[in-house]
A protein has these predicted regions:
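Short secondary-structure boundary/capping segments
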Residues: 111-113, 189-202, 310-313, 390-397
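Active-site-proximal helix-loop-helix substrate-binding element of RNase H-like nuclease domains
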Residues: 131-135, 141-157, 174, 178, ...
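Non-catalytic nucleic-acid-binding interfaces of large nucleic-acid enzymes and RNP effectors
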Residues: 1-74, 197-225, 264-265, 270-271, ...
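Short glycine-rich phosphate-binding loop at a beta-alpha junction
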Residues: 175-183, 308
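Common nucleic-acid-contacting/processivity interface regions adjacent to the catalytic cores
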Residues: 15, 24, 271-392, 396-402, ...
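Helical catalytic core of nucleic-acid polymerases
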Residues: 380-519
Length: 519
């Protein structure tokens, strides 16, 4: 099973790390699908209707050439692993990391890119060996190198020596997953930019088993890609899996709240602590990775990420984006069923990338602190998935929608019940999607005739006015139904393991049922 995947766009080469086979380097020519007017030998059905035949010929501008816009990583993971369910790698090399720097200016994105202050220490925990490692600049020779009680302290005479020893240790540990806290914003970008200044790009590339570390500035955020290593930010995972807002996302506050382990207190600032009590500074640096270790022991967010990623066939670093998770899961399902996926609308019409249409989502009332009486809290189980299933939502089942009128969005309710309360002679505009070109056509219809069409064809209609067929279950509904059934399956296995006091299986099945709950 894959542990990491990287596609080199310059050499058109995949680099995939497998838990049994190690590194696999290969090129792959995908199969595209050409839409045809009628069925031919070898043709497969298109999700939105019609037929398509396989071809190896790529044409960027052909709107009838399908599955040409699938992300390279999603494509290869689908091709190699679409038959596998609920399978995760047998092992991972997981390393926790935290860096400390001399205090300078505010840690803005611009400051991090300039990386003006030296790195003073780097703390690591190797999950495989349980070893704690702290590399620290000790210019005055106050401490000796020690390696006992699973704690390795490595003093260095200079920042450059620290960087060299860190890179050697990093290569030795060979992590498949690198985890920090707020590390997507600070630790990893600062490490990249500072190392680039002090030792150069060639040395920075030692962070990658493929010798390729890349920087991109996307949406104003620092993003560092270490080819072959999955970098996960535990703060972002916490925000994903703990959906309620925390009063503070500082590591010490989260550690204190969830595992009763906070940061080490000190007087003054880190610069004075480093100067006056270097051993306390070491403990301070190690405490940060110890908090991450304790959080994972309780919350299991890394294990959850691994499981969800393999259920959906996505790279681990895509876990933060629900759209990628959904796309991976749908591509996997369609591949199994022999159904061809349509291209994204932006593939046919790039101008849609700049089309920022807004629509109303859930209405959230800002809570007002205070003491209240006679309060009812209704928590609907799996509300959005249940809506998808009950309405049979899907692009292939979408019939059309009632065009939004001039009224505020929340005053519009086009459910069948509400339509029947309106004047049957009232005229509304119906928009219909061309599922081949993704263009919209419209026509006008009386509400009375619309109600008859809905009832005669057994369409569902949402409050927003979107109408869906029910003669065939949508792919989204099928996937969700499968996930519901899987969760119940693992909940049963978990209960059985608990009765048998098989706690290893109990924890494993609990993780699986939790993964399907999140999905």
């Amino acid at each position: 099973m894959y542990q990491s995947v990287y596609y080199d766009h310059q050499t058109y080469t995949y680099h995939l790390r497998d838990d049994k086979q190690g590194w696999l380097d290969f090129q792959f020519q995908p199969t595209f699908w050409k839409r045809v007017e009628e069925y031919q030998d070898g043709a497969q059905p298109i999700l939105t209707g019609g037929w398509a035949i396989p071809t190896k010929k790529y044409d960027k501008y052909d709107p009838d050439l399908l599955e040409k816009d699938i992300d390279k990583s999603l494509l290869i993971l689908r091709e190699l692993y679409y038959k596998q369910d609920d399978v995760v790698p047998l092992w991972h090399n997981i390393v926790y990391i935290d860096i400390e720097i001399e205090i300078g200016g505010a840690l803005t994105p611009e400051y991090i890119r300039s990386a003006p202050m030296p790195i003073t220490s780097i703390a690591l925990i190797d999950v495989t060996t349980k070893q704690k490692i702290c590399l620290i600049v000790d210019k005055t020779g106050q401490i000796q190198e020690t390696n006992q009680d699973s704690k390795h302290i490595i003093p260095c005479k200079s920042e450059k020596e620290l960087i060299g020893k860190f890179l050697s240790k990093f290569e030795e540990l060979d992590p498949t997953i690198l985890v920090g806290y707020n590390s997507a914003y600070f630790d990893i970008p600062y490490l990249y930019f500072r190392l680039s200044q002090v030792v150069g790009e060639d040395e920075v590339n030692r962070l990658s088993p493929l010798k390729k570390v890349q920087y991109s500035d996307f949406n104003g955020e620092n993003q560092i890609k270490i080819a072959g290593v999955n970098h996960l930010d535990y703060m972002l995972l916490h925000k994903k899996y703990i959906m309620k807002e925390e009063p503070s996302y500082k590591l010490g506050d989260i550690g204190t709240k969830y595992v009763d382990l906070g940061k080490i207190e000190y007087e003054g600032n880190l610069n004075t602590l480093f100067r006056d009590d270097i051993n306390a500074f070491i403990d301070y640096n190690l405490r940060d990775v110890e908090i991450i270790e304790a959080l994972e022991a309780k919350l299991k967010f890394i294990n959850l990420t691994i499981m969800i990623s393999h259920i959906c066939n996505i790279p681990y670093e895509s876990i933060y984006w629900n759209t990628v998770m959904n796309e991976g899961a749908m591509l996997k399902y369609l591949k199994r069923e022999g159904i061809i996926s349509p291209n994204k609308p932006t593939t046919h019409n790039p101008n849609l990338r700049n089309f920022n249409e807004t629509y109303a989502g859930g209405f959230i009332l800002e809570p007002i602190p205070g003491l209240y009486f006679d309060v009812i809290d209704l928590d609907f189980t799996s509300l959005y998935p249940s809506i998808i299933k009950s309405l049979n939502l899907g692009i292939e089942t979408l019939v059309g929608r009632i065009k939004v009128d001039h009224r505020p969005t929340y005053e519009q309710n086009h459910s069948l019940e509400k339509l029947k309360e309106r004047d049957p002679n009232e005229i509304v505009t119906i928009e219909k999607l061309n599922k081949k070109t993704y263009s919209m056509s419209s026509s006008q219809l009386s509400i009375g005739k619309l109600i008859k069409i809905i009832e005669d064809n057994k369409f569902t209609i949402s409050a927003s006015g979107a109408m869906f067929r029910t003669d065939e279950q949508s792919v989204c509904s099928k996937i969700l139904q499968g996930w519901f059934e899987k969760r119940e399956h693992y909940r049963g296995l978990k209960k059985k393991a608990g009765k048998e006091e098989n706690w290893d299986d109990y924890k494993l099945y609990d993780l699986f049922q939790h993964a399907f709950k999140i999905l």
